[in-house]
Amino acid sequence: MAKISRKLQTQKRHKRLRRYLIGNKIRPRLAVFRSNNHIYAQVIDDDAQQTICSASTVDKELKEDSDKLSPNCSSSTIVGKLLAKRAIKKGIKQVIFDRGGNLYHGRVKALADAARDAGLNF
């Protein structure tokens, strides 16, 4: 029997998780996507099918700090703080965390902890 690739395992986990994680206007979903070089996070209202705010390592605000942004936990921390700041500015304090099928470890955990420290509740 062939071994299932790590990417396929992540996709299967994400499919299972999305059955239960549904964001609405009062408590939107904080979705995280992790690539090899970057990390992306969005606050999404699933009822209206609309992205409320987003942040990533390729953001314009973070371009001047591009030498510091490498694919590690410190850049995920910066993105988490930026996303929380933008969400609070739009009046969102509570979210549902969607780790996107990734394990809650490393860069995903660093982003979540930074968003919590900056004022988001989940």
Curated annotation (Swiss-Prot):
The keyword Ribosomal protein applies. One of its GO terms (molecular function) is 5S rRNA binding. The keyword Ribosomal protein applies. One of its GO terms (cellular component) is cytosolic large ribosomal subunit. Pfam families: Ribosomal_L18p (PF00861). InterPro entries: Ribosomal_uL18_bac-type (IPR004389), Ribosomal_uL18_bac/euk (IPR005484). Keywords: Ribonucleoprotein, Ribosomal protein, RNA-binding, rRNA-binding. GO terms for biological process: translation. PANTHER family: 39S RIBOSOMAL PROTEIN L18, MITOCHONDRIAL, LARGE RIBOSOMAL SUBUNIT PROTEIN UL18M. This is one of the proteins that bind and probably mediate the attachment of the 5S RNA into the large ribosomal subunit, where it forms part of the central protuberance. NCBIfam families: L18_bact (TIGR00060). Belongs to the universal ribosomal protein uL18 family. Part of the 50S ribosomal subunit; part of the 5S rRNA/L5/L18/L25 subcomplex. Contacts the 5S and 23S rRNAs. This is Large ribosomal subunit protein uL18. The gene is rplR.
